[in-house]
Amino acid sequence: MSKPISMDTTKSMTPVHVISPANIEWQTDDAGNKVPVSGEFGDVYFSQADDLAESRHVFLVHNQLPTRLANLIPKQCFTICELGFGTGLNLLATWQLWRQLRLTHPHLANARLHFITTEKHPVPFSDLAKILAPWAQRAPELAPLIEQLLASYPPLIAGCHRLNFIEDNLTLDIWLGDASDSLASLDGVVTTQRPYINAWFLNGFAHSCNETLWTERIFSQIQRLSRADTTAATYSCAGIVKRGLQSQGFVIKKSKGFGPKPEMLTAVMSEMSSLDEPISALSNKAPLSNYPNNTVVIGAGVAGLLTAWTLANRGISVTVLDKDAPLAGASGNPRALLAPNMTPIHHVYEHLHSIGYLYSGRLYRYFNQQAAIQKSPLILEQTGTLDLLVKTNIGTEQIADYPDTMATTISTEKAHDISGLKDKDLAHNLYLPQSGLVNPQALKTLILLHPNITYQQLNITNIEETQDNVILTGFESNENNESASRNSVAITTDHVVICAAYESHQLDQRIVKCRTIRGQLSWFTPTAEQMSRLPKLPLKYSGYCAPFIGQSSDAQLNHISENQPQFLLGASFVDGDANIDIRSEENQQNYDKLIEDMPELSSVLPNDISTWHSRAGIRTQTIDYHPLVGLLAQSQRLWTLSAMGAKGYALAPICAEALADMMLGCFTPLSAVTLARLSPNRARLHKVQKSHKRSL
């Protein structure tokens, strides 16, 4: 069997924050095969011969997945939840079945499979690759799936790691941490319908090997997340398992086990008295009456573009509206630095920046694959980043708790070598190997090529929500944001998502008025001599700087020549200022910050900064620094995703996933606590806004 999980019921409800990876021991079984054994629980992960067949027998056949998945209707999402990801073999078996069914059932082209799994002791990448390598040979149909899984396997930090396998319409959410905490975090925001689990894979060892697995808290969470047609399957027929399921409303049944095993257990949550009734009698079709056919996104910055792409990827027709051209605002900088704001490891479970950064990196690497096919510029240049503020933000001793693939400290010698700096003291540093530079223009171009997305330049002046739809009115505008015609344009749509940064409040006053923070970037074209002495990779200090090469599409947004080296530095920070005029004094501030932190560059940077190029944009931020993501109060069709601050390219992808899930009635990749922090209706924001109005 695949893997045990454990829960410590004596501890508090606080989630486990520091992940202890599985201790894999390789032992020889009775047949002379080398098999992986759990060092924590002293039992084998799987047998070399029959475990794939056993997985299919227990979890696929006895949850009746071949029939249930084949009977899905277009746009329907089927959700599986597994306790104990282990080596991923149950996922791979399910994925292969899903792929096979989609080939033979064309109506599944727009259906989705959502596989949620928990793991307290995840298998390290090197061990997982070694464990799965024989299965790629033994079961060739799994080989391409194993390759994709390993390519996306996340760093082992607590929280939810969303992996989207887009060509297969498969979403995998790996929740790392104690299973009971992870299940408690699965709290879908009730909008049009409450999400629920269709089938459970109760995957664990016998009660004698893992006594803390089958607890009342686990069974109560299973009940909370299920509904009348939910099924479950497990290897275990222990009395505690049967009693636990029965106490939560499941009807249980013993079935023939796999191979020599005499029996296994199946269950269904239903008023029916037995499992003998065929699955066709169970309600397998979630209500789709509220599933939107079309949605309008207002705002063509990074928040709007990622929201549009995420919804379009779910089969929804999306129209993106903006009074200006796409990326005309703060999202249109020459490059965006994708690097996390680090936090001590015990905070990471609820840390949006960490999970958002990792998901963004996976998504942008997928976009890179698409860009390569189209022979267009890459979206993410994975350069790595050296953070020189580590002592201020987190402390080098706390970096040791993170996987090296996410964040690490490097020797002073290596730091000097990769940065190109010679004189600065780099003894305290934070190296972020997966970080890099996002090309906003390339990202915009790729997203707007999606067949389900259209863009229209339109200045929206009114939004009216009715019971059946939303009606928007506005005026077409030209490139200078001037009304091209006084004839009103009306658009009717199922839903609207407002992603208009600080102007979102003007479109709907239920969205709080946010802080406006002006930021100006500077860049110049260095000579070959200067380039050889400038930093070789992005650096974070009291500002940030980065070298890059101009791409073919850059000139559409900024004064950048193709194939020419550029050096970017910034950015100014002017609170309460929404003016985007270029200011020479802010170029000077950017210069001064860099020289103050790295004096050796004073002889490298040009003395005359009047020739530098600049761009000013307005960051939008709430008073508690959390974005606004969700359905507006007293509304069924109006949403917002805004107030990303300076981290739009790291936060927008994961927030767009959460918003799409809320809109469609699915489980989000964010915990219930995090969703509450992001709600546009959270009490603290509106209390402060009302207090401010009274003081005026």
Swiss-Prot record:
Reactions accelerated catalytically: 5-aminomethyl-2-thiouridine(34) in tRNA + S-adenosyl-L-methionine = 5-methylaminomethyl-2-thiouridine(34) in tRNA + S-adenosyl-L-homocysteine + H(+)
Locations listed in the record: Cytoplasm
Superkingdom field: Bacteria
FAD-dependent cmnm(5)s(2)U34 oxidoreductase: annotated span: 298-696
Enzyme Commission number, as recorded: 2.1.1.61, 1.5.-.-
Coiled-coil residues: none
Record region (tRNA (mnm(5)s(2)U34)-methyltransferase): 1-270
Keyword Flavoprotein included in the entry's annotation: yes
Cofactor: FAD
Any one Gene Ontology cellular component term annotated for this protein: cytoplasm
Entry-linked InterPro entries: FAD-dep_OxRdtase (IPR006076), FAD/NAD-bd_sf (IPR036188), MnmC-like_methylTransf (IPR008471), SAM-dependent_MTases_sf (IPR029063), tRNA_MAMT_biosynth_bifunc_MnmC (IPR023032), tRNA_MNMC2 (IPR047785)
Keywords, in A-Z order: Cytoplasm, FAD, Flavoprotein, Methyltransferase, Multifunctional enzyme, Oxidoreductase, S-adenosyl-L-methionine, Transferase, tRNA processing
GO molecular function: flavin adenine dinucleotide binding; oxidoreductase activity, acting on the CH-NH group of donors; tRNA (5-methylaminomethyl-2-thiouridylate)(34)-methyltransferase activity
Gene Ontology BP, a term: tRNA wobble base modification
Keyword Magnesium: no
Principal localisation: cytoplasm
SUPFAM superfamilies in the cross-refs: Nucleotide-binding domain (SSF51971)
Pfam families referenced in this protein's UniProt entry, alphabetically: DAO, Methyltransf_30
Function in brief: Catalyzes the last two steps in the biosynthesis of 5-methylaminomethyl-2-thiouridine (mnm(5)s(2)U) at the wobble position (U34) in tRNA. Catalyzes the FAD-dependent demodification of cmnm(5)s(2)U34 to nm(5)s(2)U34, followed by the transfer of a methyl group from S-adenosyl-L-methionine to nm(5)s(2)U34, to form mnm(5)s(2)U34.
NCBIfam families in alphabetical order: tRNA_MNMC2
Membership in a protein family: In the N-terminal section; belongs to the methyltransferase superfamily. tRNA (mnm(5)s(2)U34)-methyltransferase family. In the C-terminal section; belongs to the DAO family.
Protein name: tRNA 5-methylaminomethyl-2-thiouridine biosynthesis bifunctional protein MnmC
The organism of origin for this protein: Psychrobacter arcticus (strain DSM 17307 / VKM B-2377 / 273-4)
Protein's gene: mnmC
